[in-house]
Structure formats: structure tokens, C-alpha cells
Amino acid sequence: MRRPSTASLTRTPSRASPTRMPSRASLKMTPFRASLTKMESTALLRTLPRASLMRTPTRASLMRTPPRASPTRKPPRASPRTPSRASPTRRLPRASPMGSPHRASPMRTPPRASPTGTPSTASPTGTPSSASPTGTPPRASPTGTPPRAWATRSPSTASLTRTPSRASLTRWPPRASPTRTPPRESPRMSHRASPTRTPPRASPTRRPPRASPTRTPPRESLRTSHRASPTRMPPRASPTRRPPRASPTGSPPRASPMTPPRASPRTPPRASPTTTPSRASLTRTPSWASPTTTPSRASLMKMESTVSITRTPPRASPTGTPSRASPTGTPSRASLTGSPSRASLTGTPSRASLIGTPSRASLIGTPSRASLTGTPPRASLTGTSSTASLTRTPSRASLTRTQSSSSLTRTPSMASLTRTPPRASLTRTPPRASLTRTPPRASLTRTPPRASLTRTPSMVSLKRSPSRASLTRTPSRASLTMTPSRASLTRTPSTASLTGTPPTASLTRTPPTASLTRSPPTASLTRTPSTASLTRMPSTASLTRKSNVNQQCPASTPSSEVIS
């Protein structure tokens, strides 16, 4: 039926579409639909597709076309390629989304072929955009059947790459949720993402970019690492938070964009999500969006974490939740607990943290948050400053080298600091991160920042004192204190973060929470080690680290230790 439909579709759409080719604009919505209408007989056979086609084209064309239209650049891009591949591909995506189930729809691409001349472009532009942008269909398509169809169709791959890249990215940049989405999907892709994320780890090399324009260089990095990355960069740079939702959906397309070329085949097997999370997320989020902040940071965290996980955790701590969460949450704790944890975090958990949305979510969620928060600079800064911070943070370094202090310092420091000494320490530590984020650059680098940290934190502390009290009240909160602190670290809104420890997640971003919620155990522990992990890990963290409570209680000691 598909083939007949396709054949018919091909004929009819081809005929009709070509006929309307002039009506390319019309074809986008009307002619194509008209074609569909003509195909109605055929379409009737595939009523669903037809409905989808008609419905989607209309909606997609209307909706997507304007967006695409808006992203004129995209359509043009598609246009150049569209006639040849893009067009077929475009249509394919369109067909895919519309008739994802109906590979025939992709097969129907023939009209695409005919329209390839023009209609396809118009339709694909309008629809594929819809398809890819729609994200779900594309993902469904790539993931469901289209992947096969797309995979089967090199153009499709190109289409995916090009269209999703452009279309998805078109939306993605706006959605630019790469950060969050990947995390979301990351959990699934964690492993795959890990590999992909590993590059982020390689990202350390990109750290410079991170250090520089956290977002831009990584974009370079992303661009370098990921073909589509460049395109994705905008997403990363773009609203990291908002799009995420769509990200998951769009990610596949987005990932598809990258993936198809990279692994059109992989896409089907991996499913766009995998591809997307891995590459898309990675690329997009890898924590590069933040990752630039995060991966770099994460890389730093991981790399540094690995290299100087102890140092890094602190730095990561300053860096932001992700690194700090990963390193601090676990790596530091891992350090505290032992390299294994850190190694795990660093090796996998870290990567998992980084990769498994947890950290990536953390990185993404937090980094994104951090990036959004302004961690990018801070991430860069943190990464660097953190390093500097590490350098300058003898206390932190001490904390770091104390490992116990390190974790405790960061956690106890925050937790302990949160507890009693934590006031100054807490002020120092979270604010440090907070400062790290803003003043901390220099402050972070400088030891004085502690004073500054203390100084600003004083305000923050005062602000967050309640939270701190709350934080202090609850070990988990203390853990969260780390998290809030981390969040605070991540975001100056220490007050908000600390004050609203949950808000830390919320403040941090829903993703962290979502991530937490999403992969609370894994993501949470891995990614949110800071937030959830610390919150949840307190158990683990408690176990791993001297129990946040212990931490907290002993935290006094660690604090003293740290403080000392």
C-alpha cells in the first residue's frame, strides 16, 4: 500500500505538485494539500498519512513554513540543497512526520522528487520544517521508520542533517533547549552520549573556548566535533532552558541533523534520541551549550576532575553544579570516597553525569543554568577561575586536597559551612561559587574572594542564612546546600537558590529538577550529585561523604578543617 500509495502519490504528487510547482508557495500548503487532495484516493488509502499530510502540511506548512519562512536562512539553505537532496529530503521529513508510519510518505517523496524541483522545497521547507521542527514526527520518523527511510535515503540523511539541523536547529536555536533536552534524552543516551560526551571531555581542549567565549569556542569545538554542532551552537547559545522541552522531540531531528550524516543508520538503531542526546545533546548540550561551560567545565570537571578531580571538584564546585555536582557531588565525594567514585563519575558517572544527562542535565541543567545564569563566563571563569580558584582556593585546594575537606569542604564546606562555620564558609563557599560566577572570576581566583565571597556571601549568607538555616536544618538541605550553594554557586541567586533550595532545582532550572525527576537516581546522583545527588546522595553522599549529616556534623570539623 505504501508503495502503491507512493507510486500513486509519487505520480499524483509529482504530477500535481510539479503541475503546481509554480504554485510552489501554494504548493507548500495548498497545492501540496491539493495534491494530497488529488491523491486523496491514494491518500485515502493512507488516510492517516493523508490526514497527517493534509493536516500536517497545513499546520506544518502554516506553522512551520512561517518559522522556516522566518528562518528564511534555513529555507534558503534548504532551497539550495532542497532542489536536489533537500527537496526530496525535506519532503521526506515532511512525509516522515506526516506519514512517519507511512514510509510511503517518505517514499511518497517522489512527489518530493518531482517537487524536488521546487514544490519539495516549498513543501519540505514548510513541512519538513514542521517535520523536523515538529521534532516529534522527525524523531518518530528518524527513530520510528523514517530513520530507516531517512537512513535509506541519503538525502533523507542529508535531509535530517540539513533539515533537522536547519529546521530543528532553526527551532532549536530558539528552542535552544539543547541543553535541557539532551539531558532529558541524555539519560537514555547517557551511554551513547557518553561516547559523544567524551568529546566534551576532550572538550577540555575546548576549555580554552570555554574559557574564552564559553559558548562560542565550544561552538567552534562543537562545530569541530559536531558538524551540526555549529548549527546547534545557536541552540546552545540560544535559550538553553526553554527549548529543552521541545528539544527532546526536536533533538532527534536535531540529532538527526548531526546524526544522519554521522549515523543515519545509527539514528534508527540508536533512535534519533540516542543520536540526538549523544551528539545533539552533546553537541547541543553536550554541556557545551552549557557544556562549553559544562563540558568544558565538565571536561574540566572530568578532565580536571580526573586530572585534578579533587581540585576540579572544588573548581567544578565553583564551576557550577555540574562539574561541582559531578565532581563535588561525587568526584569530590568520589575523591573523598575514593577515586573509584570519582573515577566512576569522572570515567563514567562524570561522563555519565556529563553524559547521563545527570551531569549533563546538571551540566546542561545547571551549566545551562549556569550558562544561562552566566556561568558560561563563570564556567569559563569557573573552569579557569575555578582552576584559578583551585589555585587560589588553597582552602578550596585544601578543601580539595582534603578531599574529605574537599567533598566536605564543598559539601560540608557548604554543608558544614552551611551548618555552622559554614556561615563564613558557607558564605565563602556558596558565595564563592556565586562569586565565582560573578565577581569570583577575579575573586574566585583570588583568595580574598573568600573575603569577597564571605563579603558578598555575607549578603548572600544573610540572604541565604535562612536557607542556610534550612539547609543546615536538613542534611539533605545541607546537601542541597551544596546544591543550593551550588545553585548559588551556579547562580548568584544564592538567596533564591539557598532560600529556595528546591528553587535551586527550580531556580537552577527545572531541568535539574526535571533531570532530577527524570533520572533522579542516576541523573540525580550522577548529574545532580550536587542537587539531587547531594540531596539524594546525601544518603550516598552521606555514605560516600561523611554523610551530609556527618558531613554537616563533622562538617564542622571539615569546616574547621576547611576553614582551618
Swiss-Prot record:
Region described as Disordered: 1-564
GO cellular component, one term: extracellular space
Protein name according to UniProt: Uncharacterized protein DKFZp434B061
Organism: Homo sapiens (Human)
Feature: compositional bias, Polar residues: 1-17, 153-168, 318-351, 467-564
Low complexity bias spans: 79-97, 114-134, 170-179, 272-299, 378-416
Biased composition (Pro residues): 250-271
